Amino acid sequence: VHPNSATRAWSFDLTTGEFLTLDALASEEGDLQGNSLQESIYWNIYEQIAQKGLSEGYFDDYDSYLQDFPTLATLNFTENGLTVTFDQYVIAPYAAGPQVFSVPYSEFYNALSEHAKTILDVSQEQTVTADFKAAATLWSWFYMDDPPMDYNVTAEVDGNLYDLADIKGVETLEGLRALLLRYVTPELADEWLGSTEQRYRDIDGRLYVMSAGRGGNESLGGYTCTAALDGDSGVLTQTVTLLEWDDTAQAWADTGKTEAYEYPFTLVDGHAVFSAFPYPY
């Protein structure tokens, strides 16, 4: 007979004495893509499982359990992020043992409420990395993907079809520029906006977008970030994994090589504002 054990942990808001729950910590708007706090954490765990090949090894029909992780797992905040622990049998066989996932604050910081950011002990490096990820999302709206859009509300201008932008807190083109300025310098903001020609435009006082996503560079894998600070300025270094196509496996394979990119920034009102953004994807 296999012995059974269970892990339980609780976190408290020391300013109120109440339990810390994800619902209490989440912002109403979610992150820039509209992902809730729970969704942001879920996607990181999902990616960890995929990267390690665990879904092929011994996990079976686990996705619904992951999506409901606040109910089915034990959550514990640490100095590095959130530890999510599933006991035996929940998402894997007993022999696999408890499944423990560490999710860095930088992966879900942008979906936290402002109050949550004041009570969680998040390092400056993690907040800078979170700002970098937000800036990368904004970059992608101009050079790789589409921003959140309401496809049920459309308009046609000069033969081009536009969808209503569904970016939280952004109603107009000027509002989009203001959002950019939270994360990049005015020069970069104007460069990004200028690269789109008429893709983003105000129609009847609302921001509309022409769909034009191209997808990413498939020869680049995941990346890691480190931030070096010197007072109110610093440099974030992004180290990207290089991939090559494997004809036999019909898949992209790790070459064992990496490339590094540097992003200088200045801290403004607690946010990292980047003055260069050589994002390679």
Regions found by a protein language model. Name each.
Residues 8-11, 222-227, 259-267:
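Hydrophobic/aromatic beta-strand elements that line small-molecule binding cavities or substrate pockets
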Residues 199-247:
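Surface-exposed, charged secondary-structure patches
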